[in-house]
A protein has these predicted regions:
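Hydrophobic/aromatic-rich, well-ordered segments within soluble, folded domains that form packed cores
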Residues: 160-187
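Short, positively charged and aromatic/hydrophobic N-terminal segments
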Residues: 10-35
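Internal catalytic-core helix/loop-beta-alpha segment
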Residues: 135-162
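Long, compositionally biased
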Residues: 191-232
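A structured, charge-rich N-terminal accessory region that forms the first stable segment of a protein
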Residues: 41-105
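Short, structured patches in soluble enzyme cores that scaffold and shape functional sites
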Residues: 73-75, 115, 193
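A glycine-rich, hydrophobic loop/mini-helix early in the fold
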Residues: 84-142
Length: 232
């Protein structure tokens, strides 16, 4: 059952809308091929622009470097968002990527793209299990049940449970410290807030950024999105 735009907006506002962020990126890069996005009379986003948007925000996950990414979409910028997303199902399924619409309103939707096998293994790590257990999850449950519980909490609380970092593959140490320090006193801020081993995290973040740049360049050069998505 869809929640109202007002109900879901308090969650959506916690993370950037990929469409709007992409417009900023579009202005910086001056990509004329995506100039439709800056026109007030633009009606819908093309498939190629959607692929570029996915690449810009989710390349590390689609290229196999990162196990998951959470993106928000403004559905009115698509002629048919459901159909657009569904058209990628064969590619994602073949490459081992699952898609879960975590929270949805009339206007916005939060979509989790994740490599189920990797996340399923990750949540069974001793430190990840301990954190989930401390947050009230059944750490013996399979990934599907854990995600259903995460989804339920997001709908009820209308905010991001801190443990969502575990489902995005963030180090449990960083997730736990984020909770304990209430998001403050971190050693490094990048793709997430780092509390332990900032040097390793800095190198990882640099790899993610390089991956995104390479992915987007290949798309610009004419590569097919499906060919750039790595199987796992």
């Amino acid at each position: 059952m869809h929640r109202s735009c007002m109900e879901v907006s308090c969650i959506i506002d916690k993370i950037p809308l990929v469409n709007e962020n992409y417009l900023q990126y579009n202005d910086i890069r001056k990509r004329e091929k995506f100039s439709f996005a800056n026109r007030k009379d633009a009606m819908c986003m093309s498939r190629s622009s959607f692929e570029a948007l996915l690449g810009f925000h989710g390349a590390p996950t689609f290229a196999g470097e990162k196990p998951a990414v959470l993106l928000s979409f403004k559905k009115s910028q698509f002629e048919d968002f459901d159909a657009m997303l569904a058209s990628f199902t064969p590619c994602f399924r073949c490459k081992g990527i699952s898609v879960l619409r975590l929270v949805e309103g009339e206007e916005y939707v939060l979509v989790l793209f994740y490599r189920a096998r990797r996340i399923a293994r990750f949540v069974k790590r001793a430190d990840a299990r301990a954190l989930l257990r401390s947050c009230g999850y059944d750490d013996d449950a399979p990934l599907s049940v854990l995600l259903a519980e995460l989804q339920r909490r997001m709908e009820i609380k209308k905010t991001f449970p801190h443990e969502i970092g575990i489902f995005l593959g963030y180090p449990p140490e960083d997730v736990r410290s984020f909770i304990e320090h209430r998001g403050k006193d971190f050693a490094l801020s990048g793709y997430w807030k780092v509390y332990g081993n900032p040097d390793a995290a800095r190198a990882l973040f640099a790899r993610y950024t390089a991956c995104s740049e390479e992915f987007c360049k290949k798309l610009d050069d004419g590569a097919r999105f499906e060919d750039l998505v790595v199987a796992s």
